[in-house]
Structures are given as structure tokens and as C-alpha cells.
């Protein structure tokens, strides 16, 4: 494997220490290489510089109704073994955010009986952040010959394509879950009996410049296959 010059970063999520490349991104010191994040100058540049935003820092404008249709159509162009479309999109409208906040507030004590007023305030913030909110639902066909695992992978690919579509139109997205995605009360408000929330995706424009985050070195995560020795 080819190696490249690196810096040592402590506390990387993939281990106590991880090797990353020092860079400056959007005028901020980060790790990687000199780049413009979400660079739309070409398809390749956009893929190479894709960066999520923090949902709480996404502000108006968000995608129009026509742009949302484009984004969801792009999202559906994903690998899908068996052509099962094992995913759904649920759009939470601007006028429904308070209803979502109320739903999460009712679910919070079920998740944390000791929840404080600060926890409730955070739940309220979650429901109202960013101009547009899409709930991606994993809806696998359980008794099909295509394994559920493969169908769930397709759902993850749909969510990633959704972010790519939003980025291509100049927006920034954030894909998160949190405890609410695993709350039965919240799940049942968006999903059928055997479906699950794959994520809450928030779209808008960044209120602050995006900052690059640590990325693993290719040499640390990719390797040439070594066939096993014959028994």
C-alpha cells in the first residue's frame, strides 16, 4: 500500500490515536487537504469534498417543493437488489414541527425517566431545527428471498444519495438518529409495524462555514486480499 505524510490525531473515534493529513478547509485548521467543501465545480469535486452540516446550524432557505422532488428522485437511484424499493420518505412540514416536538416530549420520559427541563428544551430544538426535515424509513420485505440486511443497505444508500442530491443543488444536509429514532412511540408515528427509522435528514444552508473533520487514511482501511492457505 502507498503511504502518505501524516499527522497524529489523539482521540480519533476509530481508536485512541489515528493518523490523518493536516489541512486548512474554508480558512479553518482541520485535517485532510486544502479544499473547498461541497465544491460543485464538477461531479467528482462534489464527491471528493462532500461534508455534512450540523442540523442545528442549518438555516433558510431550504429546498423548494420542486427541488425536494428532484432530491428524492435522485435518492431513489440507488442499488436495490430485487427492485424492492425497501425504503420510504416522510416529510415533516413546517406547520408540523410543533406536533413533532410534542411527540418527542411525550416519548422522552419513556426513554429517560429522569429527564430534566434541559432535556426537554433540547428535544424542542431537535424538532424545530433546519428549514426542511425528511424521515428516511427502512421498510424491508421480511419474507423475501433478498436478505433483510441487503435491503437495509439499500436504505442507507438512499439516504446517502439524498444528501448528494441536496449538495448538488447547493444545500447542506445532516443525517442523524439519536434516541428518538429508537423510541417506539416516535417510530410508530412514522413507520409501519415492521419498519424502522433509518435517520432524520435535515436540509438547509449553513449558518457558519463548514469545517472539515478527521478522515481515515486509505492505507489504514483498504488492503489487497490475501487468499487463505489451503488446509
PLM region descriptions:
Residues 186-198:
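Short, electropositive alpha-helical surface patch
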Residues 129-132, 171, 194-197:
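Short coil/turn connectors at secondary-structure junctions
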Residues 109, 128-141:
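Acidic-glycine-rich active-site phosphate/pyrophosphate-binding loop
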Residues 75, 134, 140-188:
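Small-aliphatic-rich amphipathic alpha-helix that forms the alpha element of a beta-alpha
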Residues 1-34:
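N-terminal amphipathic/basic-hydrophobic helices that include classical n-h-c signal peptides
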Residues 22-129, 229-231:
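N-terminal amphipathic, basic helical "cap/leader" segment at the start of enzyme domains
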Residues 36-49, 196-231:
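C-terminal helix-cap and adjacent tail motif
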Amino acid at each position: 500500500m502507498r503511504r502518505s505524510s501524516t499527522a497524529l490525531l489523539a482521540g480519533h473515534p476509530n481508536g485512541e490515536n489515528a493518523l490523518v493529513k493536516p489541512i486548512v478547509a474554508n480558512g479553518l485548521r482541520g485535517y485532510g487537504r486544502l479544499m473547498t467543501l461541497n465544491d460543485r465545480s464538477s461531479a467528482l469535486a462534489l464527491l471528493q469534498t462532500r461534508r455534512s452540516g450540523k442540523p442545528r446550524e442549518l438555516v433558510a432557505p431550504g429546498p423548494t417543493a420542486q427541488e425536494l422532488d428532484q432530491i428524492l428522485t435522485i435518492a431513489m437511484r440507488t442499488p436495490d437488489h430485487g427492485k424492492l424499493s425497501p425504503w420510504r420518505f416522510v416529510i415533516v412540514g413546517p406547520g408540523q414541527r410543533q406536533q413533532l416536538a410534542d411527540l418527542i416530549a411525550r416519548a422522552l420520559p419513556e426513554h429517560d425517566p429522569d429527564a430534566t427541563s434541559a432535556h426537554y428544551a433540547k428535544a424542542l430544538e431537535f424538532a424545530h431545527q433546519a428549514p426542511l426535515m425528511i424521515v428516511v424509513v427502512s421498510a424491508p420485505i421480511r419474507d423475501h428471498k433478498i436478505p433483510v440486511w441487503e435491503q437495509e443497505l439499500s436504505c442507507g444508500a438512499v439516504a446517502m444519495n439524498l444528501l448528494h442530491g441536496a449538495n448538488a443543488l447547493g444545500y447542506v444536509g445532516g443525517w442523524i438518529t439519536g434516541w428518538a429514532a429508537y423510541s417506539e412511540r416516535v417510530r410508530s408515528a412514522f413507520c409501519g409495524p415492521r419498519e424502522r427509522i433509518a435517520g432524520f435528514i435535515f436540509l438547509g444552508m449553513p449558518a457558519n462555514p463548514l469545517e472539515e473533520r478527521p478522515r481515515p487514511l486509505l492505507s489504514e482501511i483498504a488492503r489487497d486480499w490475501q487468499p487463505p492457505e489451503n488446509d
